[in-house]
Amino acid sequence: MNAPVTPKKLIKGALGDWEVVIGMEIHAQVTSRSKLFSGASTAFGAEPNAHVSLVDAAMPGMLPVINRECVAQAVRTGLGLKAQINHRSVFDRKNYFYPDLPQGYQISQYKSPIVGEGEVLVDLPDGETIRVGIERLHLEQDAGKSLHDQHPSLSFVDLNRSGVALMEIVSKPDLRSSEEAKAYVTKLRTILRYLGTCDGDMEKGNLRADVNVSVRRPGEPFGTRCEIKNVNSIRFIGQAIETEARRQIAILEDGGWIEQETRLYDPNRNETRSMRSKEEAHDYRYFPDPDLLPLEIEQAFIDGLRTELPELPDAKKARFVAEYGLSAYDATVLVAERASADYFEAVAKGRDGKAAANWVINELFGRLNKEGHGIEGSPVSAAQLGAIIDLIADGTISGKIAKDLFEIVWGEGGDPRAIVESRGLKQVTDTGAIEAAVDQIIAANPDKVAQAKAKPTLLGWFVGQTMKATGGKANPAAVNALLKTKLGIE
């Protein structure tokens, strides 16, 4: 169960506080080479209608054949969500007319989905963790795409996407703020990517969200909900929820009532607008598809997939904290993407985990974000970053030189140790050379020397001047020790 609603999750209205209640329906495109009921390719970016089988085009007499891999991907996802896998599920026809739906119905699952109840643990930015219930997961066909910008007076239909497998993942109405909703979608996308069941690419439409929003006074029954369709970015999800909640509050405080309807979010105008009245199940006239037998899944099939599951984000985070001594925050950052977690582990192998995490999060991620690269496009390999950390650990270079070395490797590549040798970047550990630099700084600043005993914080200034004089190559520990002795600072 979620914790009681705190004031920070309430929305201030003109006539008091309101609570927003949010449920999510995530449409995740299944990662598979072919479609749910045909052998046509699912490859993105092809010419219109290049990947359309006779089944996808609803030619008379064409019968659907279930794709075993799509079923396996749905089961893997269910297992990753700690959900009940149903041994028997049924495909139904969901009847409605739309130009990009050539059959006149969508093959979906209604009363008997492939996956039942589960849950997702969601870490919020403030450190709180909430538990979001999963109501169900079912398989269904995607529709095609209507193109309205190809001709001044005609619309065209591209059926490349028609029949592609989707998983619709329905949450319980457990979310209470836009921040919770964004964090939930982010976590769910991470789990899907770890499992390899959906790439989560929202720009390509491979992950889309329908957001159900209602408002109520704290402690009162649920209000009437509106569904915001096809929100295609996490940022827009947050904005759509905030905008829709404010719209509903304004209506209710003005004495009106909320009509249950489907709405669209316009990010350019930051508003939701009515699309159509919200359909009920009976409007779609669901009935079992007579061309498809009920789907029977054996326990051995489920168990086999369970043994193949990768280590998922929550388990990996717990292991990083226990094994490497990381903070919960650092571990959360590192496991957000599977590739990032793998990179960190390669860097940390045989080294201090905290030092590795510090370099990966602060230096590498900071630079990647600045340059707009993902971890896969990092110019600095895990082996190279590990070598830089080794050079610090064995005293060959200082932390300051290490940052300069990181920049060199980022821009030019190469072996870090060889670069240190060839460019003379080794840390000065010769006490005599360091002492000469220290003596020179002390001799040049008698006024500060006189103040140092009474003001020990001046030690930092002397250290900085000495490091500057040695080009950052002096061993910081040796510099500190010498200065403390010569300045008489305890």
Curated annotation (Swiss-Prot):
User: Source gene?
Assistant: gatB
Name the Pfam families for this protein: GatB_N, GatB_Yqey
Task: State the organism named in the record.
Answer: Methylobacterium sp. (strain 4-46)
Annotated Gene Ontology MF terms? asparaginyl-tRNA synthase (glutamine-hydrolyzing) activity; ATP binding; glutaminyl-tRNA synthase (glutamine-hydrolyzing) activity
Superkingdom of the source? Bacteria
Q: Which UniProt keywords apply?
A: ATP-binding, Ligase, Nucleotide-binding, Protein biosynthesis
> Keyword Nucleotide-binding: yes or no?
yes
Q: What is the name listed in the Swiss-Prot or TrEMBL entry for this protein? A: Aspartyl/glutamyl-tRNA(Asn/Gln) amidotransferase subunit B
Report the catalytic activity.
Answer: L-glutamyl-tRNA(Gln) + L-glutamine + ATP + H2O = L-glutaminyl-tRNA(Gln) + L-glutamate + ADP + phosphate + H(+); L-aspartyl-tRNA(Asn) + L-glutamine + ATP + H2O = L-asparaginyl-tRNA(Asn) + L-glutamate + ADP + phosphate + 2 H(+)
The keyword Protein biosynthesis is annotated on this UniProt entry = yes
InterPro entries linked: Asn/Gln-tRNA_amidoTrfase_suB/E, Asn/Gln-tRNA_Trfase_suB/E_cat, Asn/Gln_amidotransferase, Asn/Gln_tRNA_amidoTrase-B-like, GatB, GatB_C_1, GatB_Yqey_C_2, Gln-tRNA_amidoTrfase_suB_CS
Q: What does this protein do?
A: Allows the formation of correctly charged Asn-tRNA(Asn) or Gln-tRNA(Gln) through the transamidation of misacylated Asp-tRNA(Asn) or Glu-tRNA(Gln) in organisms which lack either or both of asparaginyl-tRNA or glutaminyl-tRNA synthetases. The reaction takes place in the presence of glutamine and ATP through an activated phospho-Asp-tRNA(Asn) or phospho-Glu-tRNA(Gln).
Could you tell me the EC number(s) of this protein? 6.3.5.-
Q: Which Gene3D superfamilies match?
A: 1.10.10.410, GatB domain, N-terminal subdomain
* GO BP terms in the entry: glutaminyl-tRNAGln biosynthesis via transamidation; translation
Q: Which family does it belong to?
A: Belongs to the GatB/GatE family. GatB subfamily.
Q: How does it assemble?
A: Heterotrimer of A, B and C subunits.
Instruction: Provide the disulphide bond pattern.
Output: none
Q: What is the lineage of its organism?
A: Bacteria, Pseudomonadati, Pseudomonadota, Alphaproteobacteria, Hyphomicrobiales
